[in-house]
């Protein structure tokens, strides 16, 4: 219980740091909805949570608060010392550095597109670092949920763009020991975390939950990872939970960060079809409708509508190019990338201001022209021009029609054609794409 309280205090002060910023009034209105989640332990009941309000009232936790704050300040001090000790060569790199944020939702091809930047040796690429934040910090349902969570996600991304990987320690459970961790989500999907000095020799007793793919590395040393980030010319982050563009304005206006944002979208009918396969239990209501005729309840349909509306609102804001976003936002359709991967990769690189390397082109060719596509739903090896519309043969028209009804505004903005019958849906010779040029000069 003592350790649990320590974890709670640490996260509470992370949120306290956010409250100090511009959004102080917003966060204060939702503090009663804030929930902290902790990993299961023998002495902790599953699904147990502690609210931020109860933490402030629990005087027994005050004794731990000083130690918790000191831990956070110590991490910041460690990062600051690394920056101060950076060589003149590293400082030159930082001066011309570009920062890229790839925003997407699940099953939109973001892992595949993210590899376009992961394969560039000049880029420090992080694969979904907010996964740990999302699993640790949640909010009770309510109108302010998206606001509060977006602010926390944004602030973590801001620190990561500045190569402050110690920030992640506040959301890792079990906690990192001397900046060593074996549980960073999908570490193997970030080349920068599995190469050079970051790939330390494995030691006995050190187990990686998400090991590197091609090399046998020891536990991830966040100090070495931070140093590697500072030495790379550019930083790119692929993230899923951060979806509301308007909350990124402080990040865009941060003079230390030269940020470009790419929003990746996909036909919502295809997204639902893919999620039904990848997450069968979560989308069981839709599968039952497809197989047994049981109509999903309004809540399930409402989730689809809400997702589409969030995507539309973000894209509309980005395309409108307000002064703070001028030349900093690009909307890309997954389907366009699947059809012309090299061309679209070149567009994204040109937009980001980062040179595209031969290694990236080689990877794209080898992973989009493979002789046989992988059956692994998480694979990035695809015959992309053949795979992107495969969903049309498996999704029942009655489900596609519901998605069209609730997502029509977003589909029209993104240029996805509606279908009127099952025959048209299954006819892959009839394109569902309208010509769109979202390139912003």
UniProtKB/Swiss-Prot annotation:
Q: How is it modified after translation?
A: N-glycosylated.
Q: Indicate which residues are glycosylated according to the record.
A: 47, 58, 221, 427
Enzyme Commission identifier(s): 2.8.2.17, 2.8.2.21
- Keyword terms, alphabetized: Carbohydrate metabolism, Glycoprotein, Golgi apparatus, Membrane, Signal-anchor, Transferase, Transmembrane, Transmembrane helix
**Residues noted as binding 3'-phosphoadenylyl sulfate in the record, renumbered to the chain:** 106-112, 266-274
Q: In which tissues is it expressed?
A: In electric organ, it is moderately expressed in spinal cord and electric lobe and undetectable in non-neural tissues. Expressed in a punctate distribution in the innervated portion of electrocytes. In the CNS, it is localized within the somas of motor neurons and neurons of the electromotor nucleus.
Gene Ontology cellular-component annotations: Golgi membrane
Q: Which GO terms describe its molecular function?
A: chondroitin 6-sulfotransferase activity; N-acetylglucosamine 6-O-sulfotransferase activity
The places in or outside the cell where this protein is found are: Golgi apparatus membrane
According to its UniProt entry, the protein's GO biological process terms are: carbohydrate metabolic process; chondroitin sulfate proteoglycan biosynthetic process; N-acetylglucosamine metabolic process
* Transmembrane stretches, start-end: 5-21
The catalytic activity, as recorded, is: chondroitin beta-D-glucuronate + n 3'-phosphoadenylyl sulfate = chondroitin 6'-sulfate + n adenosine 3',5'-bisphosphate + n H(+); 3'-phosphoadenylyl sulfate + keratan = adenosine 3',5'-bisphosphate + keratan 6'-sulfate
> Which residue stretches are annotated as topological domain Cytoplasmic?
1-4
Q: Which residues lie on this side of the membrane: Lumenal?
A: 22-441
- Domain of life, per lineage: Eukaryota
Q: How does it sit in the membrane?
A: Single-pass type II membrane protein
Identify its protein family.
Belongs to the sulfotransferase 1 family. Gal/GlcNAc/GalNAc subfamily.
- Known function: Sulfotransferase that utilizes 3'-phospho-5'-adenylyl sulfate (PAPS) as sulfonate donor to catalyze the transfer of sulfate to position 6 of the N-acetylgalactosamine (GalNAc) residue of chondroitin. Chondroitin sulfate constitutes the predominant proteoglycan present in cartilage and is distributed on the surfaces of many cells and extracellular matrices. Catalyzes with a lower efficiency the sulfation of Gal residues of keratan sulfate, another glycosaminoglycan. Can also catalyze the sulfation of the Gal residues in sialyl N-acetyllactosamine (sialyl LacNAc) oligosaccharides.
List the protein's name. Carbohydrate sulfotransferase 3
Q: What is the lineage of its organism?
A: Eukaryota, Metazoa, Chordata, Craniata, Vertebrata
